[in-house]
Amino acid sequence: MSSGRIIQIIGAVIDVEFERNSVPKIYDALQVDGTETTLEVQQQLGDGVVRTIAMGSTEGLKRGLNVTSTNAPISVPVGPATLGRIMDVLGRPIDEAGPVATEERLPIHRQAPSYAEQAASTDLLETGIKVIDLLCPFAKGGKVGLFGGAGVGKTVNMMELINNIAKAHSGLSVFAGVGERTREGNDFYHEMKDSNVLDKVAMVYGQMNEPPGNRLRVALTGLTMAEYFRDQKDENGKGRDVLLFVDNIYRYTLAGTEVSALLGRMPSAVGYQPTLAEEMGVLQERITSTKSGSITSIQAVYVPADDLTDPSPATTFAHLDATVVLSRDIASSGIYPAIDPLDSTSRQLDPLVVGQEHYEIARSVQNVLQRYKELKDIIAILGMDELAEEDKLVVYRARKIQRFFSQPFHVAEVFTGAPGKLVPLKETIRGFKGLLAGEYDHIPEQAFYMVGGIDEVIAKAEKL
C-alpha cells in the first residue's frame, strides 16, 4: 500500500502528494491516517499529486497528514444482510443496530450491462393511482421520473408509490436518499417498519446536511446494492426483480456542480458542470433490466424554479420511460396528486402494450382536457354563457375528469384524516369510460373530488 501526504485542502477537495512511481488510479479510495475520512481520487495532476473528493467532513484535517491508498475503489456491503438496514455512502450502518453482517462487498463504480445482456419488458406495473395508471402507465423494469418544483408533492407521491408497489411487490427494494431531508428518511424508515416490509428494503442515505462527496456517490452506493440483487441468480438461474427509489436525482447533479469548480473545470450553462450529461448517463445506464433480473426505478426530480428546460431536469428526461410531471397550478386548485395529465407521458401508452380500449380512453380524456384548456381564455373573457352547447358539455366533463383524478393517499391519512384509496386499473378504465360516454353527466362535480372508484362517486352523490 502506497502512502502520501495532504498538501492542499479547499472545502471538500483535497490534493495529496505520492511518490511518482506509486500514484493511485482514478476512483481509488484513500484513507486519511488516524481519521475515519475516506477520499476518492478524481484527477492526476502530475508530479505524483492527485486531486480527491472527501467522502465526509474535512473538519480537523490539515496539511502534512499521512494518507494511505487502498489500491481499490470504494466498495460497499451487498446481499441479504443489507436488508432492513440504514447505511451511509460507504456502506457503514447509521441505524445503531451493529455492523452489517456480510463478507461480500462490491465496488460502487461498475460497467453498465452490455447491449446483448439487456432485456426490455412490456409488463405493466399497476400503481393504484388513477391518473398514473390511465395516462402514464409504468412498465416493470422501466424508469420513471417524478418531476416537480418545491412543495408540489414529489416525495408524497413517491411514498405512496412505495406504499402501493413495494408492499404488494414480493421482491426487494432499495431506497437511496440523495441530498434530501433527514426527516423524510426517518418517516420512510418508520413507514416501512409499521407495515412490516422493513426486512425487504435496504436504505442508503446521504442527506442534505452531508458534504458534496457523500451526495455525489450515495446514488451509486444504492444502485450497487440493487444490481447485486438483480444479478444474483437463484437455483433456476434467475435474478430478482428489484425496485430502486431515488429521492432526489437533482441533488446528485447539484453535488457534482458543487465539486466541479473546485476540481478546476469551467462551468457550462447555468453554472452546471461541463460533464453533466456524462455523469447522468453513467448513473442511468446502470439502472436497467437484464436477462436475469430487472430493476424498476422511480426517481424524484426537483425542477428548479418550475423550469423544465433547466439543464438538469432536461438531461434526466432523455433517460426515462415514463415522466410524471407535477404542476403547481393543479396543486394550488386543491387537486392532489397534482399530476399534469397533459404534460405527463409514457412509452407504454401504446395500443400494442396497454390494449386498444385503454389507449382510446386515455387519448379521449386528454383531448377533452386539451379542449377545456383552449376554452379557458374564452370563458375568462366572455363567460360560460357564450359557449356553444357542445363546448359547455366539454367543460363540464373536463372539470369532472380533473376532480376524478384526485385521490386520497394512504401516506397522507395522518394529515387529511381521509382513508387512502387504491384503485385497480379495470375500475379506473370503467370510470373514465362512463364519464366520457356521458353516463354521469347528471352527477354534480363535487361528488368526483377525492374519491377512489366510480362507485364511490355515485354513493357520494346520493348523500349530497
From Swiss-Prot:
Residues at which ATP binds: G148, G149, A150, G151, V152, G153, K154, T155
UniProt xrefs under SUPFAM superfamilies: C-terminal domain of alpha and beta subunits of F1 ATP synthase, N-terminal domain of alpha and beta subunits of F1 ATP synthase, P-loop containing nucleoside triphosphate hydrolases
Record membrane topology: Peripheral membrane protein
Residues spanning the signal sequence: none
PROSITE patterns xrefs: ATPASE_ALPHA_BETA (PS00152)
Pfam families with a match to the protein in the record: ATP-synt_ab, ATP-synt_ab_N, ATP-synt_VA_C
Domain of life: Bacteria
SMART domains: AAA
Keyword list, A-Z: ATP synthesis, ATP-binding, Cell inner membrane, Cell membrane, CF(1), Hydrogen ion transport, Ion transport, Membrane, Nucleotide-binding, Translocase, Transport
Catalytic activity: ATP + H2O + 4 H(+)(in) = ADP + phosphate + 5 H(+)(out)
Similarity section: Belongs to the ATPase alpha/beta chains family.
Function statement: Produces ATP from ADP in the presence of a proton gradient across the membrane. The catalytic sites are hosted primarily by the beta subunits.
Oligomer and partners: F-type ATPases have 2 components, CF(1) - the catalytic core - and CF(0) - the membrane proton channel. CF(1) has five subunits: alpha(3), beta(3), gamma(1), delta(1), epsilon(1). CF(0) has three main subunits: a(1), b(2) and c(9-12). The alpha and beta chains form an alternating ring which encloses part of the gamma chain. CF(1) is attached to CF(0) by a central stalk formed by the gamma and epsilon chains, while a peripheral stalk is formed by the delta and b chains.
Name assigned to this protein: ATP synthase subunit beta
Organism field: Acinetobacter baylyi (strain ATCC 33305 / BD413 / ADP1)
